[in-house]
């Protein structure tokens, strides 16, 4: 799997730029600070549930799940990249019972 884009990058490239929205104007429309939106589009903060709601309301052809899924995919990829560096001993699991 490739490195999924940060949702802030998606927001900037597919929504804000094509609409000609500045960070200041978009932040005002979303009801958040310019700093908060700038941090999101620059990948310095994640899409929260509240932000996903705001984005879905601001861009009606999207939905809350889209924004949260974008964040989840981005997070999962980065976690997978770190997995080998984390040393953990697996627990022995009891055998699974089969039912017929």
Language-model segment annotations:
Residues 1-21, 66-69, 100:
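A short, Lys/Arg-rich alpha-helix, primarily the initiator
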Residues 65-100:
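Short, charged recognition helix plus adjacent turn
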Residues 33, 44, 62, 71-74:
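The DNA-recognition helices of helix-turn-helix-type DNA-binding domains
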Residues 29-32, 56-61:
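A short, basic/aromatic helix-end/turn motif that makes direct DNA contacts
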Residues 20-38:
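Short alpha-helical DNA-recognition segment
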Residues 44-57:
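Short, basic-rich loop-to-helix N-cap that marks the start of a DNA-contacting helix
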